[in-house]
Amino acid sequence: MLEVTATDTAALTGSSPSSQARRYQAKGLVDEYAHDDAVRLLLGTVATTAARLDKVVTPLLALFDGHHVRISLLVQTSKSEATAIGKSIGWRVRCEDVPYRFVQHPDPEALKHASGPMWIGPMWHKEIAGRMTEERALELCHPNPEDIEKGRNAGLVWGDDDIEHSAREVRRGVRYIAEAADLMSRDHLLLSLDALPRLCKVGGAPKMEKLLTALTAAGHNAARYPDLEPMLVTDAPFDAVVQVVQATSTSSDRRVE
């Protein structure tokens, strides 16, 4: 197991292009995918470094969390898999017909609208991330009444507000992870809720829960993605997302071209 935390988010997201180029030999675009790009860039850096040592990594969980990026990886020795690391490294190219595509070798024109090189493989481990529910986190990380009483007897100054705040922070730390675990362990489409009006030509973004319910009803998998911004992840093709978004918008919300 390898746990890596990086705090140089300006470099990882590309908001500091010179730092990004110097530290990670990468090029970024600062848009709704900057946080995901930061996670993938760190994953790619660790994966390629490991490959030089005949090691291969399997991401277990990778998140942009406030002012840092956290990744958890399983590291194993395998010369053959380390040699094939190139299949998991590529670029995210912003496109006109879809929000983005992952490609391994963008042409010079596409490179103008691309960020990378970065990890383009699965981001999470389905079973491990799927166990990170709020209930399990509270069970493991939040003190029970007996522990709190022992602490108070030892001088801990903790009132009911402190207990509630602690529980709230524990929940926040794992919120949405279990629900998104399956999708994040395979090919998926990541979308910013705030970008959907522009992408789908509607006047306003639908409510997150309404959109997730509609996508599920249409036969797709969809979940909220844990990020500072409202993001969702789905296995629906983008044209299906557009249809669902337009169908859940009222006629007055439609943009006139």
Residue positions per predicted region:
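SAM-dependent transferase fold signal centered on methyltransferase-like domains
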Residues: M1-E257
